[in-house]
Amino acid sequence: MFLGFLLTLTLGGAGILPAADEEPPPEDPLEAALRIAYEGRKRIQEAIRDYTCILTRRERVDGRQMGYETIFVKVRHPLEEQGRVVQPFSVYVRFLRPDRVKGREVIYVEGRNGGKLIVRNGGTRFAHITTSLLPDSPAAMQHTRYPITEIGVLNLTKRLIENGEQERGNENCEAKLVQGAKINGRSCTVVQVAHKVRGEGLAYKTARILIDDELVVPVHYSAYDWPQTEGGKLVLLEEYTYTDLRLNVGLTDRDFDHRNESYLFLKSYSP
């Protein structure tokens, strides 16, 4: 879907097609990945108002390998009218696994609740405690690499674009683009970016992004550090997979209100 498109060469301002018996020059894999990401960002911003999904993540935090977490997510993208935000970026999550955090609920609405998360603890101890936390506070970041403000496929797309633009022209970077992968039965294109030599300031050795061919949005990202010993396995830094994406389901303010009767937050809590 994304490869093999016709490239035109320019000479003196005129468009010239390759001769019939000539193969068009292959597109650089990194540039192809960026093109897909730009298309995805445009589609998300113009056509996707909100969505629900399942996020499965695994991270290394402060040198500790965390286990898999499975999270149900609702996201509503911001909406502006005449330069005024009429619908802020909004997130609701409920942890499904593991038992340590099962049932935990978190709500974040940009610009509301004093900029804080509303959190119901969940898990096996003090499950119904409801409190407020700054998204980047030590308590909120205790078991994760990123604040909830960076969750979602649009933020993942933006990160892909930022990383790709930084790698342009980097001779230490090798990129590959492979079609035919599947996540949860859905066809995806794989983008792999790898650094050949360890260097100062490199965030990873190898990163893999899977882009849903139909939705044109990234649904998986994983990054690995160099092996701890010569010839050893790459060390997982972070892994995020979005499945069961349901787009434009019509989420409302009630979906991001802790007093929603289907949520288990303390209803009398005032952030």
Language-model features: locations:
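Boundary at the C-terminal end of the N-terminal hydrophobic targeting segment
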Residues: 19-21
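A short, polar/charged loop/turn motif at coil->beta-strand junctions and beta-hairpin connectors
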Residues: 5, 47, 87, 185-187
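N-terminal mature ectodomain segment of secretory-pathway/periplasmic proteins
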Residues: 31-126
